[in-house]
Amino acid sequence: MALLKSKPTSPGKRGEIRVVHHHIYKGKPHAALVEKLKKTGGRNNQGRITVRHIGGGQRQKYRIIDFKRNKDGILGRVERLEYDPNRTALIALISYKDGEKRYIIAPSNLEVGATIQSGADSPISVGNCLPLKNIPVGTTIHCVEMKPGKGAQMLRSAGCSGQLVAKEGVYATLRLRSGEMRKIHVLCRAVIGEVSNSEHNLRALGKAGAKRWRGIRPTVRGVAMNPVDHPHGGGEGRTSGGRHPVSPWGLPTKGYKTRSNKRTDTFIVRGRKKK
C-alpha cells in the first residue's frame, strides 16, 4: 500500500492523492459471490428524494460478504485480496477445505496464501474469528457482532479497530476508536486484527468529477438557494442567512443531537469523546 501524489499536469491532477495497492487482484470478482446492484438515485418507491446528493456514478456489482464467519473448525486459505467498490476496506476471497469460497473483510497484514479459521478453538492470530469470551483482554479486534449469531455490525470500515478491555460475567467491554466504551455479550464474535486500507482517509479525489464517478452529487449551500427551498435562502445580494444554521427542514444543524434514546443505551458505559 502506498500514497501516490499525481504530477500537476492539470488542475484536477494537482491536488490528487491516490492510495495504490500493488498486491491486490486486478481481475473480475468471483461470479458466484456477486449480485446485481440497482441504483436508486436517492429515491424511494414513490420516486421522491429521501437521501440527497446521490445519483449517477459507475455501475457496480455487490460482493456478498461473510459477516457471520460460521464455518467453525474448517481451515480457509486466502486466495486473493480484492478491491470492493461498495466499501472502504479491501476484501479477501477465502477458499475453504470443503471447497466453498467466501468473501471476508480483509484485515491489515493478511497475506495471500495465509490460513484462517473460525470457532472457539481458533488461535489468536490475524483474520481468525472467535467469540469474545475466548479472546484475551487487550487484543485488537474488528468486525464485531452486536447480537450473537447476527453477523458483524461494528468496526467494518477501512482502518477501524477496537480493543477488548475487560470481561465481566456475560458481558465484555470494548473501547472504540471514538473513545466510546461499550458492553457486548461474550458470545458475540469478533475478528482478530484491524481492518485493512488504513490510509484511506489520506486520499484526496482532486476534482469534482471523481465524486461524480462515485455517485455523489453536489451539495448546494442554503444561502445560495431561494426562500422556497431553504430557510437561509433569498435576500438581496449575498447574505449570511440571518439566523443560526439550520437544515432545509428548520432543525439546528451544528452540533444538535438527533439520536433518540434507545434501550441499548444501557450498554454504552462511556460516550464518545467530544471534539
Curated annotation (Swiss-Prot):
<comment type="function">
    <text>One of the primary rRNA binding proteins. Required for association of the 30S and 50S subunits to form the 70S ribosome, for tRNA binding and peptide bond formation. It has been suggested to have peptidyltransferase activity; this is somewhat controversial. Makes several contacts with the 16S rRNA in the 70S ribosome.</text>
</comment>
<dbReference type="InterPro" id="IPR022669">
    <property type="entry name" value="Ribosomal_uL2_C"/>
</dbReference>
<keyword id="KW-0699">rRNA-binding</keyword>
<dbReference type="InterPro" id="IPR022666">
    <property type="entry name" value="Ribosomal_uL2_RNA-bd_dom"/>
</dbReference>
<dbReference type="GO" id="GO:0002181">
    <property type="term" value="P:cytoplasmic translation"/>
</dbReference>
<dbReference type="GO" id="GO:0016740">
    <property type="term" value="F:transferase activity"/>
</dbReference>
<keyword id="KW-0689">Ribosomal protein</keyword>
<dbReference type="Pfam" id="PF03947">
    <property type="entry name" value="Ribosomal_L2_C"/>
</dbReference>
<dbReference type="GO" id="GO:0003735">
    <property type="term" value="F:structural constituent of ribosome"/>
</dbReference>
<dbReference type="InterPro" id="IPR008991">
    <property type="entry name" value="Translation_prot_SH3-like_sf"/>
</dbReference>
<dbReference type="InterPro" id="IPR012340">
    <property type="entry name" value="NA-bd_OB-fold"/>
</dbReference>
<keyword id="KW-0694">RNA-binding</keyword>
<dbReference type="InterPro" id="IPR005880">
    <property type="entry name" value="Ribosomal_uL2_bac/org-type"/>
</dbReference>
<dbReference type="Pfam" id="PF00181">
    <property type="entry name" value="Ribosomal_L2"/>
</dbReference>
<dbReference type="InterPro" id="IPR002171">
    <property type="entry name" value="Ribosomal_uL2"/>
</dbReference>
<comment type="similarity">
    <text>Belongs to the universal ribosomal protein uL2 family.</text>
</comment>
<comment type="subunit">
    <text>Part of the 50S ribosomal subunit. Forms a bridge to the 30S subunit in the 70S ribosome.</text>
</comment>
<dbReference type="GO" id="GO:0015934">
    <property type="term" value="C:large ribosomal subunit"/>
</dbReference>
<keyword id="KW-0687">Ribonucleoprotein</keyword>
<dbReference type="GO" id="GO:0019843">
    <property type="term" value="F:rRNA binding"/>
</dbReference>
<dbReference type="InterPro" id="IPR022671">
    <property type="entry name" value="Ribosomal_uL2_CS"/>
</dbReference>
<dbReference type="InterPro" id="IPR014726">
    <property type="entry name" value="Ribosomal_uL2_dom3"/>
</dbReference>
<protein>
    <recommendedName>
        <fullName>Large ribosomal subunit protein uL2</fullName>
    </recommendedName>
</protein>
<dbReference type="InterPro" id="IPR014722">
    <property type="entry name" value="Rib_uL2_dom2"/>
</dbReference>
<feature type="region of interest" description="Disordered">
    <location>
        <begin position="223"/>
        <end position="260"/>
    </location>
</feature>
